Amino acid sequence: METSYLKTLELDKIIARAAEGCVCKESREKLLALEPQCDPDEVRYALEQTDAINSLLIKNGSPRFGGVEGVSQLAARAVKGGVLSMGELLMVAGALRNFQNLVSWYGSSEHDALPTDDLFYALAPQPGLEQQISSAILAPDAMADTASHTLNDLRKKIRATENSIRDRLESMVRNMDTSKYLQESVVSIRNGRYVVPVKSEYRGEVSGIIHDVSSTGATVFVEPQAVVEANARILQYRAQEAQEIERILVAFTGQVAAIEPQFQYLSLIHISEPTRRSYI
């Protein structure tokens, strides 16, 4: 096939420009590998797709393509039994939101059957799952109290117990009989336990468990006996909290695995290609 004309047309620069706006690696690679078609029918069909997208761009404005790169791999891992993290589930929710945006964009104006119909109809938004994930997970390292009734109840117990401990210890550090043994009148945390800083020479005057010693050895951090049981309850609640978070992640991961084929987003790749061509 004669290709010298491609250099004259600077096709490589045109394709590179079109690829700049691709939202995922696969669609970018597919577009960069694009070669001129010899089959007139394929050329005609590709032009019809580009014309259809261009017409919709004029009517509806630009669609919002969000990042979806890597989501198919996450879904595949979910199918194999891997548990997705909070950050990974937020990526999944973002992809689902992207699918919904594209479907809404495509249907925002009336039109007859188009050669791009199959591409957009192949997208299957899951607004329920997307909203559940977005409501339950606030950030890659933060799950909302309202993610489940059990989680909400555990966190209320943790906060109530922590407040009770702080009140007791703050009362202790303000007490004249006790404060004279302290390096300073503060309450801190060591190894997940609330402690007070006791002067080393008075370590025997404050009954409790030593959890840490300052670098100089002048201060020992003591968990007073009065709050040992409450501190233990907090650790128990924290362990139950971690178990509940894991249970929620497993449940969401199972829902992602159930719709794994939709995350292969081959349709999104094909949508991206004629859309980027229409911008040239």
Question: Regions from the language model: what does each represent?
Answer:
Residues 154, 158-161, 241, 245-248, ...:
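Intracellular alpha-helical coupling/juxtamembrane segments of multi-pass membrane proteins
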Residues 225-251:
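Internal alpha/beta scaffold segment
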Residues 186, 190-221, 231, 276:
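SMC-family hinge/dimerization module
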Residues 153-202:
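Extended, Lys/Arg-enriched charged tracts that mediate electrostatic binding to polyanionic substrates
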Residues 58-61, 107, 169, 173-176, ...:
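Coiled-coil heptad-register positions
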Residues 1-154, 262, 266-276:
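Conserved amphipathic alpha-helical "coupling/scaffold" segments
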Residues 19, 76, 138, 166, ...:
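Signal for well-folded cores of large energy- and translation-related assemblies
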